[in-house]
Amino acid sequence: MAANVQTSSLLFLVFLLLQNFYSANSQSFLGVNYGQLSDNLPSLQATVNLLKSTTIQKVRLFGAEPAVIKAFANTGVEIVIGFDNGDIPTLASNPNVASQFVKSNVMSFYPASNIIAITVGNEVLTSGDQKLISQLLPAMQNVQNALNAASLGGKVKVSTVHAMAVLSQSYPPSSGVFNPGLGDTMKALLQFQSANDAPFMISPYPYFAYKNQPTPDTLAFCLFQPNAGQVDSGNGHKYTNMFDAQVDAVHSALNAMGFKDIEIVVAETGWPHGGDSNEVGPSLDNAKAYVGNLINHLKSKVGTPLMPGKSIDTYLFSLYDEDKKTGASSEKYFGLFKPDGSTTYDVGLLKNTQNPTTPATPTPTPKAAGSWCVPKPGVSDDQLTGNINYACGQGIDCGPIQPGGACFEPNTVKAHAAYVMNLYYQSAGRNSWNCDFSQTATLTNTNPSYGACNFPSGSN
């Protein structure tokens, strides 16, 4: 176990170092859903200009309108286009429909419009429509064949988007399995996707998990806020947020069927900033916390316990509010931006602006009296590694503990954890609960700074 902990910590630090080579003005893992069920949307050109002003690098469309695809030409934005569920029967029965679609909606614009994937349907396998379910794979195969005929088979991927309900079990994450009722259908679908190197697209929404269990602990777990965490009884991994738990449950389900190497893409996730007064969870503060902390978590490249050291491609839901959506009122209020291009809440998506939830690097100052957050004696390296991953995943500047940084030496898990745990405590508000870390931390009045390594405090 000790060797695994040291390896895990080292891998984390290596990936943390590598992330500095990526441009601060782009986040290649981050996309957004561009829904258009609204009567108050800005013009298409205004939307393109808005996205170009952000760090968002991908956009998912729910259709394939030629004007929209063309508008994103030469922008560098990667595009996912899609078929509605209602298109599936015709696609499945008539290969010519797929061929014509590829000719008119892909070849006419590619590569100037950087189309990277085509989604065939949304949440089909959990629709309950057995006929539609049986037609899904033939429809996808016809689209794939049309792309192959156009020499685009290896460049434009074919997938379909699933709800978390495709899993019959998701907790603990290591026990994740697909609904056995999907049986051969899911296996055939995964064989197709594996053969074509296509991603498995899923829509995890921690918001709905909180809605089903609205407790303060669940909210903190869903919003990436400090919490006691949950230990997976199957493998001992500790989870500090619901997003990682849901994604790893999908990974476990894929692994259980022999397809652990299929890439997982989060097709949509978000949190409503408004809703009816009787709805639990929607609020501006909760939406900002979830989306902002999710972005910081992805940016950190910590990954998940089962897929460490990488950022999963994630499409936020959604670009704008959609007042024509049906269902609960909250369904209308997932928008990141307002029609005038201003932010609904600021999570640092605009280029050349700092994420407001990401503290700046503290300026070293002379040591002074104050309070500092440090590990308790006797805490294991395993627990401290989890604290490092959590704190750095919240967006604090962990550069000083990277090789060459002022706090890299001594190169021990305990020393690195002490620095980042304190920095998180100071940045998060200096409340006692900001120095809890599942009861592995304590406050001290003794300044732990040493040499050039400065531990900031409230009085610094």
UniProtKB/Swiss-Prot annotation:
GO MF annotations, alphabetized: glucan endo-1,3-beta-D-glucosidase activity; protein homodimerization activity
Catalytic residues of the enzyme: 123, 268
Major location (coarse): secreted
Cysteine disulfide partners in this protein: 373-435
Reactions catalysed: Hydrolysis of (1->3)-beta-D-glucosidic linkages in (1->3)-beta-D-glucans
Tissue expression: Expressed only in pollen.
Origin: domain of life: Eukaryota
EC number: 3.2.1.39
A GO CC term attached to the entry: extracellular region
Example GO biological process: (1->3)-beta-D-glucan catabolic process
pH dependence: Optimum pH is 4.5-6.0.
InterPro entries: Glyco_hydro_17 (IPR000490), Glyco_hydro_17_plant (IPR044965), Glycoside_hydrolase_SF (IPR017853), X8 (IPR012946)
SMART domains attached to this UniProt entry: X8
Keyword Kinase: no
Keyword field contains Hydrolase: yes
PTM annotation, UniProt: Glycosylated. Contains two additional disulfide bonds, but it is unclear if they are between the pairs Cys-392-Cys-398 and Cys-407-Cys-453 (PudMed:18096638) or between the pairs Cys-392-Cys-453 and Cys-398-Cys-407 (PudMed:12392450).
Glycosylated residues in this chain: 355, 447
Top enzyme class: hydrolase
Region span, Disordered: 352-371
Signal peptide: 1-26
Cell compartment(s), UniProt: Secreted
Alphabetized Pfam families for the sequence: Glyco_hydro_17, X8
UniProt keyword terms in alphabetical order: Allergen, Disulfide bond, Glycoprotein, Glycosidase, Hydrolase, Secreted, Signal
Family under the similarity heading: Belongs to the glycosyl hydrolase 17 family.
Notes on the domains: The N-terminal region (1-350) contains the enzymatic activity while the C-terminal region (360-460) can bind laminarin. Both regions are allergenic by themselves.
Protein name listed in UniProt: Glucan endo-1,3-beta-D-glucosidase
